Swiss-Prot record:
Domain note: Forms a beta-barrel structure that accommodates hydrophobic ligands in its interior.
Sample GO molecular function, one term: retinal binding
Name of this chain's protein: Cellular retinoic acid-binding protein 2
PROSITE patterns, A to Z: FABP
Tissues expressing this chain: Embryo and skin of adult mouse.
Subunit: Interacts with importin alpha. Interacts with RXR and RARA.
Length: 138
């Protein structure tokens, strides 16, 4: 079983603003979010299939607790409440499908994968727009 535990720092980000645009976030809020999310602090605690993930930026801090295979409530990256279900896709990759609790919007999901060279790859999607953020342990 992969060990996602640790404090992670971002080294690369692609398409974050484009994903926010696909979610309908206005230009002013996108600029603020992109600046704030340029250096997020990510803390992951893992015990077997149970996870705690805290992501802190200068604008907002999010915390989620979940167990693989059990539905839980969280918020989409743009703050809309949703039900999420995380499953193992492979030995080193978990995928999460999100379902909005109310209203309409793009289909959203995320995945986290540990690479053989120790990087953590976070992929977030909004319909067909894919954002990739790469982290290394601090």
């Amino acid at each position: 079983m992969p060990n996602f535990s640790g404090n992670w720092k971002i080294i690369r980000s692609e398409n974050f603003e484009e994903m926010l645009k696909a979610l309908g976030v206005n230009m002013m809020m996108r600029k603020i979010a992109v600046a704030a999310a340029s250096k997020p602090a990510v803390e992951i605690k893992q015990e077997n299939d149970t996870f705690y993930i805290k992501t802190s930026t200068t604008v907002r801090t999010t915390e989620i607790n979940f167990k693989i295979g059990e539905e839980f409530e969280e918020q989409t990256v743009d703050g809309r409440p949703c039900k999420s279900l995380v499953k193992w896709e492979s030995g080193n990759k978990m995928v999460c499908e999100q379902r909005l609790l109310k209203g309409e919007g793009p289909k959203t999901s995320w995945s986290r994968e540990l690479t053989n060279d120790g990087e953590l790859i976070l992929t977030m999607t909004a319909d067909d727009v894919v954002c990739t953020r790469v982290y290394v342990r601090e």
